[in-house]
Amino acid sequence: MRILFIIIQLTLILSACAYQQGKQGQNVEKESTRQQETKPIHVKDTTQETKDNGTRTDIAKHLVSVAEKNPDVKDATAVVLGGYAVVGIDVDDTLDRSKVETIKYSVAQALKNDRYGANAVVIADPDTVSRLREMSREISEGHPVTGILDELAAIVGRVLPEVPNDVIDNEDEPQTKQQNDQLNRKQQQEMEKEQNDQSDHHMKKNNND
C-alpha cells in the first residue's frame, strides 16, 4: 500500500513537471513570436536618392543666387550632379565677346569665394545654357541621372569655361599689366635712343664730309 502511494506521488510530480515545462515552452514561443512581430524590418532607404536630389537642387539654387548677384547677369541656371557643378549665365546679346568673358570671370571669382562654388564651371553659351536649364528641370522631375551626368561631363569637356580654382587672382592682373606697360616703355625708349644715335652718327659723318 505504501509502495502504491509512493508511485502515485511520483506520477503526480512528473506530470506537474511536464506541464510546467510545456507551459514555459509555450510562453517562450509566444514571446519569440511577439518579438518578431514588433521587431522593425530594415529595408533599403528608397528616399535616399530623393534626399540627394534635394541637396543637389538646394546647392544649385544657391549657386544661381550667387551668379545673379552680378548686375550684368540677366538670369542664371545651375546643375550639380556627381562631381560636376555647372553654372550657366544669360547676358545681354548685344555684348561683345570680351565683355562676356569679363562677366564670366567676375561670376567665377564670386563662386570661387563660395563654399559650394569653388569647383563650379561657368558658361555663357546660349544653347548650352538652355540645355542646362532643361537638365535641371529633368532632375527635379526625377528623371534618371545617368544620361544627364554623361551629357554634363561632355559639356564640361567641350566648352572653354572659367574654372574658379584656376582663375588668376585680381591682385595679380594689375601687376602683370603694369609690368607689361613698363616693359613696353623701356623697349620704346631703347628704340628711340638707338634711332637718335644713328641720326647723330649720320650728321657727324655728313659734317666731316
From Swiss-Prot:
Residues linked to a lipid group, N-palmitoyl cysteine type: C17
GO cellular component: a single term: membrane
A biological process term (GO) from this entry: sporulation resulting in formation of a cellular spore
Region annotation (Disordered) ranges: 26-54, 165-209
Any one Pfam family match given in the protein's UniProt record, by short name: Spore_YhcN_YlaJ
Compositional bias annotation for Basic and acidic residues: 28-54, 183-209
Gene: ylaJ
PROSITE patterns linked to this entry: PROKAR_LIPOPROTEIN
Bilayer disposition of the protein: Lipid-anchor
Predominant cellular place of this UniProt entry's protein: membrane
Record localization: Forespore inner membrane
Annotated knockout phenotype: Mutant shows a reduced rate of spore germination in L-alanine.
Keywords, in A-Z order: Germination, Lipoprotein, Membrane, Palmitate, Signal
Signal peptide: 1-16
InterPro entries: Spore_lipoprot_YhcN/YlaJ, Spore_lipoprot_YhcN/YlaJ-like
Name under which the protein is recorded: Probable spore germination lipoprotein YlaJ
Lipid sites, type S-diacylglycerol cysteine: C17
Role according to the record: Probably contributes, directly or indirectly, to early events in germination.
Keyword RNA-binding part of the UniProt annotation: no
